[in-house]
Amino acid sequence: MARARPPPPPSPPPGLLPLLPPLLLLPLLLLPAGCRALEETLMDTKWVTSELAWTSHPESGWEEVSGYDEAMNPIRTYQVCNVRESSQNNWLRTGFIWRRDVQRVYVELKFTVRDCNSIPNIPGSCKETFNLFYYEADSDVASASSPFWMENPYVKVDTIAPDESFSRLDAGRVNTKVRSFGPLSKAGFYLAFQDQGACMSLISVRAFYKKCASTTAGFALFPETLTGAEPTSLVIAPGTCIPNAVEVSVPLKLYCNGDGEWMVPVGACTCATGHEPAAKESQCRPCPPGSYKAKQGEGPCLPCPPNSRTTSPAASICTCHNNFYRADSDSADSACTTVPSPPRGVISNVNETSLILEWSEPRDLGGRDDLLYNVICKKCHGAGGASACSRCDDNVEFVPRQLGLTERRVHISHLLAHTRYTFEVQAVNGVSGKSPLPPRYAAVNITTNQAAPSEVPTLRLHSSSGSSLTLSWAPPERPNGVILDYEMKYFEKSEGIASTVTSQMNSVQLDGLRPDARYVVQVRARTVAGYGQYSRPAEFETTSERGSGAQQLQEQLPLIVGSATAGLVFVVAVVVIAIVCLRKQRHGSDSEYTEKLQQYIAPGMKVYIDPFTYEDPNEAVREFAKEIDVSCVKIEEVIGAGEFGEVCRGRLKQPGRREVFVAIKTLKVGYTERQRRDFLSEASIMGQFDHPNIIRLEGVVTKSRPVMILTEFMENCALDSFLRLNDGQFTVIQLVGMLRGIAAGMKYLSEMNYVHRDLAARNILVNSNLVCKVSDFGLSRFLEDDPSDPTYTSSLGGKIPIRWTAPEAIAYRKFTSASDVWSYGIVMWEVMSYGERPYWDMSNQDVINAVEQDYRLPPPMDCPTALHQLMLDCWVRDRNLRPKFSQIVNTLDKLIRNAASLKVIASAQSGMSQPLLDRTVPDYTTFTTVGDWLDAIKMGRYKESFVSAGFASFDLVAQMTAEDLLRIGVTLAGHQKKILSSIQDMRLQMNQTLPVQV
C-alpha cells in the first residue's frame, strides 16, 4: 500500500528548509540569580548521531531517518505516515532510561504533523494526534513482544496534539510539547509513542527532571533539592545559616515547588554581633577595626563611641581607653566615662562636738550625671600623721546620711570633745566601682571644742528601806572629758520640792526619806566644761515599816513556789503517762487506718474519704465519678502534656444536656495497672468536692481506650502563666478577689479534712471570668524524678515542692491544713508579684536553709502592707499560730470592703536585688523580764533605759514607737530598727490567738 508523503525531516538542502523553520524562541521569565529551576537530562536524542534503534511495532509503522537541526547538526528522527490505511496502531518504544532516584520526569517532544485536509483521497481515520506512554522496570527487560503493546501495562501520559499542522505546500512547522509523569518508584522506565493514523515526524525527544538550585536567601544557605512526585508537591529543604549568621526563628527551611522554584520561606537568619550584611543578604561581613555591632540583626556596624576603641575585626563592643569605664547599667553604645575629680572648696563649721561640712561640685564630672558624695570620718590620735588616724565609731551621726549624698552639705554630730578628726569628702559616680583606684576626695582637718558630758543613760535601784534608797547608774556614753562628779536631784512625787546630793562615784545612798513614799530621781555628770543634761526621770519607792517582815517572806517565796511547782509537775507527769498507755492499748490497731482515712465525724458534715483506703480502688471510682459514654466526647486539640499522658480540649454532649467545653486528661498507652489506679485516683478525689472554687469533675471514661478524666474547661489555664502573660494589667481589688476565691476553695477543702499538699499558682486554674479554682488533686505524690525540673524534690520517699511547702512538712512529712496555709501564703506572693518564681533562682537547699533561719520573702512591688502581713502570718514557724482558712477568708472580705486599707503600700521592692526578710522571732513568753528580752536580741545595753522610762512590762513595750525609743536614748538608727522589728514580732505573737485584724 502506498504511503502518503510524511513530513520530511529537516535537512540542509534549500528546498527542504521551509519544512523545518527555525524554532520559535519563546521569552523566558528570568528568575533572580540562584533561584532559577535547574533541569537535569536523562535522555536527549538531539545529541545522538548513531542509530537510535528503538523498538517499533509493527515494523511497517515507525521509520528511523536522518536529518539536520537548525544549527545543521545531524540528528536521528522517527516518522510515520500510514494515513491511507485504517485502524492504525503503530508503537515506538525508546531504550531503557535510568531514573536516578527522581520521582517525577518531564518529557520534551519536538514534532511536526501534516494537516489531514491537505492529503487527498484519505479515509476519515486520518488523525493529527499521537499518544505518549511510559513503562517502569527495575532493569532493561523489554523485548519485541513484551510488555504487550497496549495501554495496560503501559501507562498513558497524555494525547499529544500539535499547535500547528502543515499542508503539502506549507513549510513544516515544528511543535514543542512538554509533559510530565510520576511518581516513579522503580530503577528506570521506557517511553512509548502510539500512532493511530497520523502523518508526522518525531524530531527529538528529551527526558529530564527538575530541581531547585542551591540558593542563599535571608542569610541562609539552601542546598539543591529535587522536586516532588506531583506538580503541586512542596519539598522541604532545610537551611543553614551562612558563616557569621545566627538563627532568629526556627525551623529554618525553604520549599521547592514542582516547577523547581523556591517559595514559602520559613524561619530566618540574621548577622551575628560584630557582623553586618553585605552582598544583598548573602554575606555577613565582620565589622572593621574601629567599629562594632552590639546586637544581632541587619543593622550596620557603627563607629566606636567616644573614649573607646577596637583593635580587631568583628567586635561586638568597643573596649574603653585606659582609665575610662562603662557602668553595669550602661549600654554597649554608651560612651566610656571616667571617675570625677575631687570636690572643691570644702568648708567646715565646728560647734563644740558637732560639725557642718559644705563643698562645691568637682571640676570634672567624668562625663556622667550620676554624681554622688561619700563622707569618711577618721579620728586621729596624738600629733602623728595619717597613720595615726582610724575610722570613727558607729555612734557618729550623719544627717541626712554618710554615703550616697546628692546634696553638697552634711551635718555631723556625736563627736568626741577635744579630738582631732579628718573628714574626706569623696566624689563618686557610676564607674567609680570599676576603677582600681580609690575615689578622689578633698580632706579637711578639724578639732572639736570643749563640751559637757552626755546624758546619764539609766538609773538602777540596788536596795530600799523605809528611810533610804541605794541607787547606781552607768557613766555617760560620751563623757567628753574626765568626769569630776555627779549631781543627783530627787524629790517626793507628791510634794515636788527637790533636794540635791553630789557623789564622785556612780552610786549614792539617799537617807532621811519617808517610808512608803514614791520619789522622782535624776542625775547628771560634770566635767571641766560644766554639767551635762539630767537623765530622764526615774521613780523609786521606799518600803513601809512592815517591809522587813515582808522582805523575809519574799526571800522565802521562791523556795515555797519551787517546791509546790515540782510536786505539781510530778503528779501531772504520772497522769499523762497513764493516759498515753491506756490510749495505745485501746487504739493502737486503728491509728494507722484513722490517719490514712483523713476524716472526722461531725453531724451533717460531708467528709473526704481517701480512695486508697478502698480494698478495690475501682470501687472508689464507681462511687464518686460518673462514667461517660465515649461517644459523647469529642477531642478537638492537644493543649499540653501531663504526668500520665496528654491533656486535650474537647466537647461533651450528654443526652438531655447542652454541649460544654471540657478539659480531657488521657492515660498514655502501655500503662501499668498501678498507673491506671493512680491516674483515676484524682477523679475519685475530685468527685467528692462541690464548690465554685474547686475544679468540677464532669466524669470519667474507663470502658474504652484511652482512659480519660473529664473536667470543666478553664479558658485562661494555669494562674502563674496567666499572671505573667498579663503582668500589671489588674487592679489590687481584682488580685485580692482572686486570692479570696482560692482561700474559699481551700476553706472548703480544710472543712472536709482534705490536705492538698501541692497548693501553688501552677495548680490554680482561671476561667474567662477570672474565677480561680483549685485543681491537681493527689497527683504530686506520684511524680517521677525529672532532674531538669527542680520544682519537686525527693524527701523521705516522696516528692515535695520545696518552695511552697511548710518547714515541718519538708522535715517530717507532716502535712496538715496548717501546711496548706503556708503554701497559700506563697500563692499570695505569686499573685501579687504576677507569677514570679518564689525565692527566684535560689537552689532548693538554699531555700530550706533560709526558711530554717527565719528568712521570709519580701513584699512584691506595690504590694499592700496588709496583704504582706497576711503572708507573714501564713509563714509563722509554729503551725499552731498560723491563721485558719476561715480567718483568711474573713480578712480578705474585710480588705475588699475597706479598699482604703489596700492603698498602704509596703516599701520593699520585689526582685532579685531585694534580700529575704529576717523574721527571727524570739518568743517573748519565754522571757521573765523586758531585760531578758533585750539581752536575747543583743540590745541589753538599753535595759536600764527601758526600766527607768517605765517600759517594764511586755504590754507597754508592744505599744512603743520610734519616738519612744528616741526619748529613752536609743539614737542609733540600726538599733532602733532592730528593736522595732522585734516589737512588731511581739505584737504578732500577742495577736495570734485572735482572727487576723484589718
Curated annotation (Swiss-Prot):
It is a single-pass type I membrane protein. Glycans are attached at N351, N445. ATP binds at I639, G640, A641, G642, E643, F644, G645, E646, V647, K665. GO terms for molecular function: ATP binding; axon guidance receptor activity; ephrin receptor activity; transmembrane-ephrin receptor activity. InterPro entries: Eph_TM (IPR027936), EphB3_rcpt_lig-bd (IPR034245), Ephrin_rcpt_lig-bd_dom (IPR001090), Ephrin_rcpt_TKs (IPR050449), FN3_dom (IPR003961), FN3_sf (IPR036116), Galactose-bd-like_sf (IPR008979), Ig-like_fold (IPR013783). Residues 925-989 form the SAM domain. This is Ephrin type-B receptor 3. It comes from Homo sapiens (Human). The lineage of its organism: Eukaryota, Metazoa, Chordata, Craniata, Vertebrata. The gene is EPHB3.
